[in-house]
Amino acid sequence: RDRSVSRGLGDVYKRQNTGSKSEDVSAAAGETYKLEYTPTLKTYGFTEPVVLKAKPQRVVSLVHTPVLALHEMGIKQVAVPQAAMLEWPADLVKDAKLLNVSMNSNFDIETVIALEPDLVIVGYQSKDTYGKILDREKIPVYYVDAGHVVSYESIKELTDVLIKAFGQHNAGAEAITDRFNKLEARMAEKRQENKGQKVMVLQSAPPRHYIQGKDGTLGSMLNMLGYENVYQNNKMVLIDLEQALSYEPDLLFCVGGSKTAAEHQQVMEEDFAKNPEYWNNIKAIREREVIYLPIKYVATAGINVIDNINELIDIIDAKKLKQNG
């Protein structure tokens, strides 16, 4: 499949006639851009790298994860997915078409083909649907990890691949690497500090409250900060009220669909007030050891995970300061 991709690339460029002089020179010099597959994708059987004959000028991302990294490295995207959990940068959306690729939309891959992309980035689950059609059109496809929860590790792996392929001597790429390195150092420090502290994570749309383990979006962030999750299962389920009384977390984190933390706090406190006999049995609620978070902690969108974790650390630090102050 991948060999046909590099063959097909030539056709794409002939079809578009977009090659500038410098591109022709780099192609003539045999310079290629190689997208290796990440360790995660290799476990799903994607092994052959995607080789591009020239730096892509018309990328379509059907997944959120690569969008910000490509944007910061100056790689032009002609279409990106709509995003509920964050605002894309204004200078990205002024040139890029917003695609509704949510599960239930009747997304038509023909709209992508019409944009004449020179690279399409697709979730690995769509290999047999969108992938087949794009292959037939000889459009290069690169598959990535996708789904409701894309782990920090997975985002970091993909970003490393994109930097290797397109980020040589690139200030944007260097800045991203620097931010990851600073975050890693900060998280290592917090892991020491938070050792032995127990947390519970509720993802709620009252009156429904789901409990999240260490594999959820927020649960995994707290895990990387050294907290122990009281819920040892990795499947998010409706909270068992009886069982929850035995958990005794030091700190409760509440996340949901609200745009701001204050809005989510209001929604949750109204719900707690409907059944105070129950909720006040949980020490963290009784003693206000609760941190409320907005929708951006429900799902990540690529390298904004760096900002989200940094902000989470700041929020927790501010709460500790207030207590000790």
Regions found by a protein language model. Give the residues of each.
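Short helix-initiation/N-cap motifs at beta->coil->alpha
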Residues: 41-46, 96-110, 234-241
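Proline-aspartate-enriched helix->loop->beta-strand connector
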Residues: 101, 109-122, 241-254
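Extracytoplasmic ligand-binding site segments that recognize negatively charged/polar headgroups
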Residues: 88, 127-131, 144-161, 196-217, ...
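Single conserved hydrophobic/aromatic residue that forms the stacking wall/gate
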Residues: 1-13
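Alpha-helical, coiled-coil/dimerization segments enriched in small aliphatic residues
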Residues: 85-87, 211-237
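A short, structured surface patch at a secondary-structure boundary
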Residues: 62-115, 119
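Bacterial Sec-exported substrate-binding components of ABC uptake systems
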Residues: 11-65, 169-200, 314-325
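Structured C-terminal subdomain patch of bacterial secreted/periplasmic proteins
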Residues: 153-178, 188, 194, 254-325
